[in-house]
Structures are given as C-alpha cells and as structure tokens.
Curated annotation (Swiss-Prot):
One of its GO terms (molecular function) is metalloaminopeptidase activity. Binds 2 manganese ions per subunit. This is Probable dipeptidase PepE. Its cofactor is Mn(2+). It comes from Mycobacterium tuberculosis (strain ATCC 25618 / H37Rv).
Amino acid sequence: MGSRRFDAEVYARRLALAAAATADAGLAGLVITPGYDLCYLIGSRAETFERLTALVLPAAGAPAVVLPRLELAALKQSAAAELGLRVCDWVDGDDPYGLVSAVLGGAPVATAVTDSMPALHMLPLADALGVLPVLATDVLRRLRMVKEETEIDALRKAGAAIDRVHARVPEFLVPGRTEADVAADIAEAIVAEGHSEVAFVIVGSGPHGADPHHGYSDRELREGDIVVVDIGGTYGPGYHSDSTRTYSIGEPDSDVAQSYSMLQRAQRAAFEAIRPGVTAEQVDAAARDVLAEAGLAEYFVHRTGHGIGLCVHEEPYIVAGNDLVLVPGMAFSIEPGIYFPGRWGARIEDIVIVTEDGAVSVNNCPHELIVVPVS
C-alpha cells in the first residue's frame, strides 16, 4: 500500500516552488485550506470543518499552519513538524482570520486561496485581509500538473495494482449475479491488491453500459451482456489508479466486435499522438477523428481524458478547445468510449505519462474486448 506520505524533503521543495510561483504572480501569499492542495504541499489529510485550518504560505517569509488547538494531534500525521512549520493554534473565541492576516503582514494584502475554501471561511478571511482573495488555481496548477518522479512512481504502482484487479474481474462476471455483487467483489480486490482504499467502482452491464457514470445496480448479468468496468483506488501517499476495460459475457455479436475494434483504434491513435509540444486538444482530436471516420462520432459523448494524481480528475483535461501544450511529467487518462442508449456501451482507459519523446502507460492489461466464457 506504500507510505501514507513522502519524505519531508519532497514537501520542502514543493513549498519553495509554491512560494516562488506566488511571488511571480504578484501576490503576498497563499492560504491553503484542507483539500488536495494541502495534501500536496505538506502531506496533510485534514478535513474542512467550521473551525479554520489553513496553511499560510507567504511569498517571502516563513510559512505557518493556523489551526484549532484540538487539531494539533492530527497535524502530527503531516510533514509539518519535520518541515519546522510555525504553528499558530487557536481556541474557540479567538479570531483565526486575524492570525492569518498577521502571518501575511497585516491588511490589506493581496492573497490567493484554494478553490476548495468554503464561503464560511472565505468571507471572514476577506474582511481580515482587507481585500477579496483570488483563486490559487493558476499558482498551483502547474506544480501539480507536472508530476515529480516520486509521484510518477506512485502512479505506476497504483496502475499495476489496478491491473491486477482487472485480471480478476472475469471470475466475478457470472450470469445471474448482480452488478452490485460484482462491485462488492471488485471493491474487496482493490484493497487486497495493494490500494489503501476504494475510490470508485462502475459496473455497467447491457444497457447500463451506455451510461458513462452509471455506478452499479441490482440488475442481473446475462449471457450476451457487454459490461463496462471502470475502477480506481487510492495508493500510498494519496495517488489514484483509474482504469476501464470492457468485457463480453459469452461471444459478442459481430456488430459489437466491429464497433469495439474502432474504439481500440481510436484509443491507440490518441496514445500515439502524445508527445511534448502537442496540445491537449490535438490528442482528443486523434481519438475523435478515428471514430468519426467509422461513423461513430455521435456515440462518443465525453472528452478523451483527464489528469490524475491526488485527485481522480484534475488538470490537464484532454478535450476540444484546450490548447495547453503537453510537457514531460504530465499524467492523464486516455479513455474514448462509445455508448448506444438502451443497448450497450464500451470504454478503454489507460493512465499515461508524457515522456521526452512520447508517452508510457502505467496500465498493461489487455485492450481487447475481454470475452468471459459461459459454462
């Protein structure tokens, strides 16, 4: 399952880079409340409550953690102590927003906050800072979008773990069992194969496969069903796996096999289009063009991919209109799908990492339509 966080040196480097990016943006500091950004910067998995917990990161100066005194024990699970971060604890009746302002040098001060900060903290913080904060998305997104070697290693291990789960899926796909039965087996396997927890399980059989985000239900599997299985878990220091394969219970009809072969070609075309200097929308177009030529464009109803890391869905998004230029270290899914309402659907998904001259996949289980024999 891996360590729950990285060594302190990793977080120290990230804090320094975030402070530099903050200064480059002309801001006095960042205020990071619990969420993926806080986990990225100091390895904290704190949750947002009505009491303010925040990492305050000045563009120049020492960072500090402002948090309720009752949360001091939980802070020890992060890298804060090893990093030597100043702790500004407070008790009920104190003004935590004033503490944040003081760390940043007093109001008024131009500050960025994470997009996960709730209004119950944003509004009093704006009063304390004397100016409405801006979102820190642009400051932090580049850091999180380009993965370090430690992150890539975690994604590779997560990918290998989810491959092992897919290798076990055929044994679960027995006619007469429900999607929920299969999902329960898969969830157990996700943890058994090395994840710390289950992120999601989609088991879409027959017509349910035409709903990309179906989930699972009490529908019983039947011979002839095409089954979309999209699964993911959390590995080690919070990094995710996410992989989709499509299964056929018994031999598929010829029209299913033909359409699926076009989907394979589309997924391969997108993968082969990836290299530094290419834009995200060009990768999306590579998959979409193959399906359009096959007369299947109207059945591909979502983007080709999404970034992945601490969050299952994060930047970069592989979608039409996104002119973001790909660089080595970016990690994202390639997952074209075709969906025939009321009939069946199919999707193939791998997580890939941009390299100096192309891309590598962290998933290596078969891309073919996987036929599950019926006894």
